[in-house]
């Protein structure tokens, strides 16, 4: 595929709607990981997401006649707000089809820009079908969230800003991947200007459609999708974005929910800003890459792609961040039901912090406990596991068991 995006990105003017966001060094994260880690702050956009770039670039290139007919989009969040704000600036009608399960705060954000919201179905696939019906009836223009040349061009302006703002060598740029629009725009521009810079995509475990598609050399459809990083949770990537990624993306990384939560905490500690899970994917990817490849003294850029966090998720993020940093391990342990048994267990734990403790009566002879223990890393966790085994306490390491972390820790009695 010929790279036709470089010139169009150079000439794209998205700044009537989007902000030129800063590229900031993450002081604490860089020090901890012994690399120069920079954050492209797309969370500081007017709609708290990079999506405004692509939506506005698509819409400002529509004819007056098309703008008069209005635009339509389907989205559960960030793209919806981008289209709504772009429509407000361009003074055209906008209809956004959103799932019935969309949080009220996101619906209100879209409506605050004057867009009409249509609630339909439970999934984005159902919303897409409904949007096409409305489009045909009203003659409006569909603004695709990622699989569109002008949308991809708009997202690519991020890459242009990165190179303009940082003149020294960059080893890799990390991007979150959902449908593939963001990484396509960045990759196409970077490979045309600085092809030596690696482009690395990051997906959430259970929502890795691009990773699987690149391995299969064709677009795959996931049977189901993990919704924790909902802003990047899609069953299938775009046709155009897949072709671009095949040509220009160097590597894909998949991270789990705990790693995402830890990345949210990392960014908060450096910036006092809270990213949404999809917005922190790139940071989680940088950390995973450094650990896996044991590199230091490199320069990495991570795109902070969004900050439309649902407030009720903060407790979950805080709870899981320590596991993501390998600072907490979760065990199920069987102890004798007799006086002094818990004291003996605590002696085995030593001076380590017990972060949580749940007791369940099992029988007259034994009891089951669910315990969180502070550790320095998972190597220490393995040593503790062996120590508990030698004491015949039948320990089970549940640190990476999603069902246990979501449900068992809340059982009592």
Region annotations inferred by a language model:
Residues 1-413:
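PLP-dependent amino-acid enzyme catalytic core
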């Amino acid at each position: 595929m010929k790279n036709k995006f470089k010139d169009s990105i150079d000439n794209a003017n998205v700044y009537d709607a989007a902000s030129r966001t800063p590229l900031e060094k993450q002081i604490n994260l860089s020090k901890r990981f012994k690399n120069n880690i920079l954050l492209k702050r797309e969370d500081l956009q007017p709609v708290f997401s990079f999506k405004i770039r692509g939506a506005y670039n698509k819409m400002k290139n529509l004819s007056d006649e098309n703008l008069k007919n209005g635009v339509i989009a389907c989205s559960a969040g960030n793209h919806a707000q981008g289209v709504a704000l772009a429509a407000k600036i361009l003074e055209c009608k906008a209809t956004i089809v959103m799932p019935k399960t969309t949080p009220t705060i996101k619906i209100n954000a879209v409506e605050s820009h004057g867009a009409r919201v249509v609630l339909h179905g439970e999934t984005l696939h159902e919303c897409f079908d409904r949007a096409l019906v409305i489009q045909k009836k009203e003659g409006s223009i569909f603004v695709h969230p990622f699989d569109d040349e002008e949308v991809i061009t708009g997202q690519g302006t991020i890459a242009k800003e990165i190179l303009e703002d940082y003149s020294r060598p960059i080893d890799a740029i990390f991007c979150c991947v959902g449908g593939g629009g963001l990484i396509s725009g960045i990759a196409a521009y970077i490979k045309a200007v600085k092809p030596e810079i690696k482009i690395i995509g990051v997906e959430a475990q259970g929502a890795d459609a691009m990773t699987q598609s690149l391995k299969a050399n064709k677009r795959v459809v996931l049977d189901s999708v993990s919704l924790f990083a909902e802003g990047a949770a899609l069953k299938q990537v775009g046709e155009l974005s897949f072709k671009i990624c095949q040509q220009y993306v160097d590597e894909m990384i998949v991270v789990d929910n705990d790693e995402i939560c830890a990345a949210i905490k990392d960014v908060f500690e450096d910036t006092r800003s809270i990213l949404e899970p999809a917005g922190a994917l790139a940071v989680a990817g940088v950390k995973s890459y450094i650990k896996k490849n044991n590199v230091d003294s490199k320069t990495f850029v991570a795109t902070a792609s969004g900050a439309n966090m649902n407030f009720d998720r903060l407790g979950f993020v805080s709870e899981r961040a320590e596991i993501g940093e390998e600072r907490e391990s979760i065990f199920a342990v069987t102890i004798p039901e007799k006086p002094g048994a818990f004291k003996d267990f605590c002696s085995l734990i030593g001076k380590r912090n017990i972060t949580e403790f749940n007791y369940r009566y099992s029988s007259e002879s034994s009891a089951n406990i669910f315990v969180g223990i502070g550790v320095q890393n998972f190597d220490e966790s393995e040593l503790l596991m062996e120590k508990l085994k030698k004491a015949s306490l039948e320990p089970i390491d549940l640190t990476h068991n999603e069902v246990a972390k979501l449900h068992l820790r809340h059982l009592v009695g």
